């Protein structure tokens, strides 16, 4: 989708060839191509966060007891999504600290941190994996803590995610905001909102309508989706070797391990737009 976004002219040319025609008049379908691709990128980012946390909680030890890594599919299928959403919310607001990733557990005849077990399983032996590697893993886990906190915060904005899941709730709305001097009516500040999406929230009890507008940040959405994918890769790929039959089939197979550091995650986490969230509300007031 990121490639499509940088080649919207080519995308539009393909769409033009397949546009509907009624009584000799073509119905244009390319007006919102860029909007649709960016909305899909945003939605895909939310899906990748949700997928990451499903694996994360499934593999997570419970009171020091490590789950059966060979039968993790059962845990995923029987996942309690409402409890997981609550855990994500707790990570986002700080009630659930990520320091537990530093706690030590016994696993495969090694004493390792939960973070090491989750993201670098099977690379515990100090004879096979030298001290430099072990230090890199510790630093990587510190970066992973920041990533998890960030994606939990992004995901905890449930109203936005729900709007994307029910696509009819997301729509282009405002083109710009202009702030004027109250006395002279001269423009002081203006913000371009042409590249944004809006969604509505209704508070029936308060008889209030809220329109939330968020500028698209496709570069960040793409990079953060890639980070989520790499975290999932680390959790799943090594386990397919440690607990699967790949080791017997491909004894000399080389596997890429992804180590994270503060520098490369900061570039992905940063926002690339000046305004991130705007809210407009209107409330029905009863006349006294």
Residue ranges: model-predicted function:
Residues 1-43, 91-288:
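Acidic, Ser/Thr/Gly/Pro-rich intrinsically disordered interaction regions
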Residues 38-42, 46, 50-53, 74:
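Nuclease catalytic cores
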Residues 46-60, 162, 236:
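Alpha-helical repeat scaffolds in large eukaryotic proteins
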Residues 51-69, 170-175:
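Short, solvent-exposed secondary-structure capping/transition elements
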Residues 64-75, 250-260:
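Short alpha-helical "patches" and their helix-cap loops
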Residues 65-100, 105-106, 113:
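Long acidic/polar interaction regions in large eukaryotic complex-forming proteins
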């Amino acid at each position: 989708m990121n490639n499509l976004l940088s080649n919207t002219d080519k995308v539009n040319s393909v769409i033009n060839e397949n546009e509907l025609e009624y009584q000799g008049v073509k119905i244009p379908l390319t007006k919102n191509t860029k909007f649709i691709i960016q909305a899909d990128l945003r939605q895909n980012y939310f899906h990748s966060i949700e997928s990451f946390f499903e694996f994360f909680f499934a593999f997570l030890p419970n009171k020091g007891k490590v789950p059966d890594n060979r039968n993790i599919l059962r845990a995923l299928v029987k996942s309690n999504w409402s409890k997981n959403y609550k855990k994500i919310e707790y990570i986002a607001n700080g009630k659930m600290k990520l320091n537990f990733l530093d706690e030590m557990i016994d696993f495969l005849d090694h004493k390792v941190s939960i973070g090491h077990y989750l993201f670098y399983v099977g690379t515990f032996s100090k004879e096979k994996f030298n001290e430099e590697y072990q230090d890199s893993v510790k630093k990587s886990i510190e970066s992973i803590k920041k990533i998890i906190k960030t994606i939990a915060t992004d995901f905890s904005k449930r109203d936005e995610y729900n709007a994307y899941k029910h696509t009819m709730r997301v729509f282009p709305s405002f083109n710009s905001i202009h702030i004027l001097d109250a006395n002279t009516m001269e423009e002081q500040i203006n913000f371009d909102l042409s590249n944004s999406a809006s969604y509505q929230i209704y508070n029936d009890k308060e008889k209030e309508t809220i329109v939330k507008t968020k500028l698209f940040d496709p570069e960040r959405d793409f990079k953060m989706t890639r980070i989520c994918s790499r975290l999932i890769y680390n959790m799943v790929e090594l386990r397919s070797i440690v607990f699967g039959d790949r080791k017997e089939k491909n004894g000399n197979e080389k596997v890429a391990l992804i180590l994270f550091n503060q520098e490369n995650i900061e570039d992905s986490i940063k926002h690339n737009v000046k305004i991130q969230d705007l809210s407009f509300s209107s409330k029905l007031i009863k006349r006294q």
